[in-house]
Structures are given as C-alpha cells and as structure tokens.
Amino acid sequence: IPFLTGHDVNQDMRAAQVSAIREAFEECGILLATDMRTQQMINQERLMELQSCREPLNKGELTLHEFLESNNLALSCESLTHFAHWITPSMMPKRFDTHFYVARAPEDQLAMHDGYESVDSVWITPEEAINQEKEGKRTIIFPTLRNIEKLGEAASVSDAISMSKREEVIPVLP
C-alpha cells in the first residue's frame, strides 16, 4: 500500500494504525509521517505548512489519500506500538472498537489542540492526571483513566514503548 512506511506493519492492524495517526494529526497536530522527498520524519516547519489541512481532513472535505499524495508524505506506522484495545459494552447505543498506541512524538513537533474535538491541552504526568480526576478537577472517562494508570507504570516514553512491546494486548470489554 502506498503512503505507509515500515515493512513490518501488521496487516491486521493497518487500518487502526492509519486511523491513530490521522486522529493525532487532526486533534493535536502531531503527524507521524515521513517526507518522501527527504525520507525523514517531518519537522515542525513542515508540520506548520500542513496545519491548514487539519480542518478539511476532519470535515471530510479532503481524504487522507489526497492529503498524503499531494504533500509527498507516508504515514510512519512503524513508529506506533500497540498499547491497549477497548470495546464499548454491547448495551451502549454507540459502540466503539478502539485500539490505543504509544509512540514517541517527534522532538521538534509541537502539539496544538484543534479547538473542536480537543479544546484544551496540558502536559501533566499520569499521576497528576489521576489525582486531579480523584479530586474532581478533571473528568476522565473509564478507559482513558485505565490507560493513564498503565502509562503511569512507565518511567519514560522509552519505558512505555518497551513495556508495550513486551505485553500482549488483550481486548477489554467492560
């Protein structure tokens, strides 16, 4: 498939990986993609040039394929490590089958919330997030809280990635 890098991309997980990278770009402005002209992960300067594409992608006015092709990009699926898999209970009116990934954000890319799906952003530790949720200062839905707790077991991004590579991801259906 064009527009994907990494020969070891799990075929069964490809759609979930593509969705994860797309969502990260649309909602927080981080794009795990390689510039096909340079064969390098895009930097902040290139990311800023692509910011105007976030809203059209989100609204469905621009397809991901069109975005990647017109900007000479390939999604870096190999930079994702499968972290968790949550499935909404069957009694819920809206159901989701969601895979979560952990990845190192490119050092020179700065996250920016989109103002629609994510309207605020803050960098805090997992412990701080959990404490704020317990104190009623922050509302965190159950799957997110469990994922944050799991991330809190890691001492660093590298540790979280290593931990995720070692552990089998078991689907959770509360």
Where are the predicted features?
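Short, P/G- and charge-enriched loop/turn segments at secondary-structure junctions
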Residues: 88-90
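Core RNA-modification/binding signature centered on pseudouridine synthases
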Residues: 142-174
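Hydrophobic/aromatic-lined pockets within catalytic cores
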Residues: 25, 29-32, 134, 152-156
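NUDIX/MutT-family hydrolases
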Residues: 66-68, 73, 77-86, 95-108, ...
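The catalytic Nudix box helix
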Residues: 1-76
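Terminal peptide-recognition signature
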Residues: 24, 101, 148
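Active-site rim elements
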Residues: 7-14, 131-139
